[in-house]
């Protein structure tokens, strides 16, 4: 059913104001709003441990070039800068699409070229997309960058990819220093690391690539739809679209799902890390610089098919594969 059939406030202006025109548009077909926005997760982040950086004099990178310089320094110091694993059974490859998407938002024309890429107006063969793949390949294929190399990239389960960050070698060095992954990954952390989010382990924003482009945030999230207009359905719809809905979850210590409601009380999050993530999503939605995961928006045979497969092929075959 259209949202107007079940939302007690028949005027949907309030809903559209609270959840941004971008998210509202994702749930709209032929002018009718069917999907109601709900929770969101933040993907434009890189996990790291401040104490490990500080002990070695490393600085948090704000730009791609700074991140590459840091990676080179870590390799020169005899360690691996990145954890990276994208095995996910039949969905293997999706993690690399997230890297591509973050790079796409920060190159070319930013959100404009990103949106055209999603709708196939901008082809995968376009130089903007090839450039994003080239930058991703730099992370994948530079010797020493990824713990375990490309073999580990294609064979390590994504939920275990960050584990080396939480282990130490005989010299007291972690297996890696940076792990680019969404806010939800904390639920996959090893038991010994549970409770570290926002304490021993935190995040920095995915670095800018083209400094002339405004900041953007990549994310995923949940949407819901109603299949009848019963009174009980209307009551649930009212609650789901309220700023109160996410409050109980936000106060859970390991909650990694943020409210997509721009009026949500950010002070309710369980710690400063999640609060900053929530504020980042809210600010990006208000500035129209939040974008949903591109592969999830593309037709399934592309976003959940050939795109995933080609990311695996890129990892295996190296940068020369980009022009094949």
Question: Which ranges hold each PLM region?
Answer:
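Extracytoplasmic/periplasmic substrate-recognition and gating elements
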Residues: 55-56, 191-260
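Extracytoplasmic ligand-binding clamshell segments of periplasmic binding protein
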Residues: 86-88, 109-192
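Short, small-residue-biased leader/transition segments that mark boundaries at the very start
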Residues: 2-7
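Bilobed periplasmic-binding protein-like "clamshell/Venus-flytrap" ligand-binding domains
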Residues: 34-35, 76-89, 242, 246-253
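Short, solvent-exposed loop/beta-turn-alpha elements that line the ligand-binding surface or hinge
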Residues: 8-21, 86, 105-131, 191-196, ...
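Periplasmic solute-binding protein
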Residues: 23-60, 68, 85-117, 218-225, ...
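Short helices/loops that flank or line small-molecule/ion binding pockets
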Residues: 1, 52-53, 69-77, 157-179, ...
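Long, aromatic- and glycine/proline-rich binding clefts that accommodate carbohydrate-like moieties
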Residues: 201, 250-315
């Amino acid at each position: 059913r259209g949202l107007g059939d079940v939302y007690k406030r028949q005027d949907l202006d309030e809903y559209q104001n609270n959840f941004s025109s971008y998210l509202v548009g994702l749930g709209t077909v032929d002018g009718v709003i069917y999907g109601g926005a709900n929770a969101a997760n933040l993907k434009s982040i890189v996990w790291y441990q401040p104490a490990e950086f500080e002990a070695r004099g490393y600085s948090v990178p704000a730009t791609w070039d700074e991140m590459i310089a840091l990676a080179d320094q870590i390799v020169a110091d005899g360690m691996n800068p990145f954890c990276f694993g994208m095995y996910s059974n039949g969905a293997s490859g999706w993690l690399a699409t997230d890297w591509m998407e973050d790079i796409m938002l920060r190159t070319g024309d930013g959100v404009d070229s990103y949106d055209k890429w999603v709708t196939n107006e901008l082809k995968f063969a376009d130089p903007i997309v090839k450039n994003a793949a080239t930058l991703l390949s730099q992370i994948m294929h530079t010797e020493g960058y990824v713990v375990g190399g490309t073999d580990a990239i294609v064979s390590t389960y994504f939920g275990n990819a960050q584990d080396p960050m939480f282990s130490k070698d005989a010299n007291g060095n972690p297996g890696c220093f940076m792990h680019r992954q969404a806010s939800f990954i904390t639920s996959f952390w090893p038991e010994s690391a549970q409770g570290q989010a926002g304490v021993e382990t935190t995040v920095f924003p995915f670095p800018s690539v083209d400094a002339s482009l405004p900041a953007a945030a990549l994310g995923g999230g949940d949407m819901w739809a109603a299949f009848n207009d019963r009174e009980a359905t209307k009551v649930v719809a009212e609650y789901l679209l309220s700023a109160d809905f996410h409050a109980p979850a936000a106060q859970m210590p390991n909650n990694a799902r943020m409210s997509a409601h721009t009026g949500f009380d950010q002070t309710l999050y369980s710690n400063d890390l999640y609060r900053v993530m929530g504020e980042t999503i809210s600010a990006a939605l208000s500035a129209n610089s939040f974008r949903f995961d591109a592969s999830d928006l593309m037709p399934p045979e592309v976003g959940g098919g050939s795109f995933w497969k080609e990311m695996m092929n890129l990892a295996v075959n190296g940068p020369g594969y980009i022009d094949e």
